[in-house]
Amino acid sequence: MDFSLCRNPRGGAVRRNSGPSIRRVHARFPQTTYLRSGEVPSDLLYAAVSSRLSRQTEGLIRGFGFTEAVALNMSNMVGAGPFITIPLVIASMGGPQCMLGWLLGAVLALADGLVWAELAAALPGTGGTYLYLREAFRKTRLGGLLPFLFIWQFIFSGPLEIASGYIGFSQYVSYFWRGMTAGEARLVNVAVGTLLIALLYRGITAIGRITVALWVGVLFTMLWIVASGIAHFHASVAFDFPAHAFTFSAGFAAGLGSAMLIAMYDYMGYYDICYTGGEVRDPARTIPRSIICSVLAVAAIYTLMNLSIIGVVPWRQAMQSKFIASQFIETLYGPKAAAVATALVLWTAFASVFALLLGYSRIPYAAAVGGHFFPVFARLHPTGKFPHVSVLAIGLLAIVASFWSLDAVISALLASRILVQFIAQIFALDQLRRRRPDINRPFRMWLYPVPGAIAFCGWCYIFLTSGWAYIAFGLLTTIGGALVYALWQRLRRPVPAAG
């Protein structure tokens, strides 16, 4: 739609548009009296945007409520991540001062979560970042480039994130399968990925029930670990700081950045419901509430869980452990209880990758519907009404990506995602507020623009301390995507803008 501002002799701004979108809005609101032929009061512009979003989500079923949304986010956030990364976080800073990385990560996640919340409430469609970048920069030169770059980096980072869950799953399976080889671990990854695709190959209402069931197992696992740690907590063990633990230096700054990178990998997922916004009931209220509740709940759980573990298992021993959760329970209750704990960790890991694939499979679908990706991904299952082609494609790519090492997967996925997704979204929110008055914002960021500034500084700090190899990877994937986009624009025939 191409709106142009015109003068209203009765007072107030109106917009002129002779396109079909406003005629459709008038059909929905026949009681509206237009000031002149072709003129529409500005309070109806949001209806036009909503009409475009409705066409994008046409055919999808809004089967997710608040409980399912929180379950989806928290299942994604609390996966295998903390159970396999606690030793890495401790090693990054060399002691219990690593808790600073977790706490700063929680602040960053909450600040960034407010960015997601306002964007998702204003644009409650399917696709998450793709949708926000497309709508925020629709009338600028970046309106085509940024959505394309997001899909481009997602081809790398999305399957990598899911694959990290597969790797963590097989790592804990080796607690039972002692002597597991690398080839056997890959077979486990393939089996888990195949089962996941089979479970997601169904309608969203059934998936919502599965998500809640998995979430219950996640909460039980975390509560057991936290309660056990509190009951056996030893402050002298938890706060056994090494000499010069808080001496600021270049090494301390780099270590803190590394700890925050790993912490944000563990926190990632607070926004997962945004990718399925077209399948959420009352998204303007449900999505912001679910994001904020998920971040606060998981931040509290992670803080208690980390203190619980390092308050029982000395940190010098913990950072060498391959099964920190199992070792923690075994120290307290013996090997049989540790076996149960390991099984629960596997349940938690599976719930996480289930939530990830559910959310990420909607991104290519939304891009295809908007004309920014291959049309085959816009297909819905004839009976289940879910994007089955996208589920299969992302699921298979994640299985392939799971053949790589865990540390490379974590660093590469964050380095490739920070610039085009997290930082670009902060500017997208500012763009919406300043240049898109036609879009209603039912939820507004608290203390704007302070949370956005905190999120921007935090993501830049993590990116710049991730290491030169991963900085180069993030920059090259972005530059490469821009070059591919330029070539694609030269080769393809122009596609009319949606709406």
Say what each PLM segment does.
Residues 225-228, 416-418, 445-499:
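A generic transmembrane alpha-helix motif of multi-pass inner-membrane proteins
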Residues 62-73, 107, 139-156, 189-192, ...:
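Select transmembrane alpha-helical segments in multipass membrane proteins
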Residues 55-60, 99, 180-188, 213-342:
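Helix-loop-helix junctions that connect adjacent transmembrane segments
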Residues 373-381, 426-444:
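Alpha-helical transmembrane segments
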Residues 28-96, 110, 114, 139, ...:
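Membrane-interface "cap" regions at the ends of multi-pass membrane proteins
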Residues 131-139, 143, 174-179, 245, ...:
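TM-loop-TM module centered on a large, flexible mid-protein loop between adjacent transmembrane helices
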Residues 170, 184-239, 268, 291-295, ...:
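Membrane-interface loop-to-helix entry segments
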Residues 88, 101, 110-193, 198-201, ...:
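Hydrophobic transmembrane alpha-helices that form the core helical bundles
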